[in-house]
Swiss-Prot record:
UniProt GO cellular component terms: cytosol
Gene3D superfamilies in the cross-refs: 2.30.30.100
Domain of life: Bacteria
Subunit structure: Homohexamer.
InterPro entries listed in its UniProt record: Hfq, LSM_dom_sf, Sm
UniProt GO BP: regulation of DNA-templated transcription; regulation of RNA stability; regulation of translation, ncRNA-mediated
Keywords: RNA-binding, Stress response
Domain Sm: 10-69
This protein's name: RNA-binding protein Hfq
CDD domains (UniProt xref): Hfq
Length: 81
């Protein structure tokens, strides 16, 4: 995964995790999963509801929070290349 992808994904998922925001995760096959983000790494998201499910990121199409989320994002410095 590119560094830019991590700059967007990690703060978003971490905010959802820390604030215990309910999410709907849509998979590429159309299945909808719901719960709270328990943990995540480069390849998987642990989604907790009545049980904890390990969802591979390559199978995720969309992550929809139940409410608006403010993402702490620091833009990388602009280089004069």
């Amino acid at each position: 995964m590119s560094a830019k992808g991590q700059l967007l994904q990690d703060p978003f998922l971490n905010t959802l995790r820390k604030e215990h925001i309910p999410v709907s995760i849509y998979l590429v096959n159309g299945i909808k999963l719901q719960g709270h983000i328990d943990s995540f790494d480069q390849y998987v998201v642990l989604l907790k509801n009545t049980v904890t499910q390990m969802v591979y990121k390559h199978a995720i199409s969309t992550v929809v929070p139940a409410r608006a989320v403010n993402i702490p994002f620091e833009a990388p410095p602009i280089s004069d290349a």
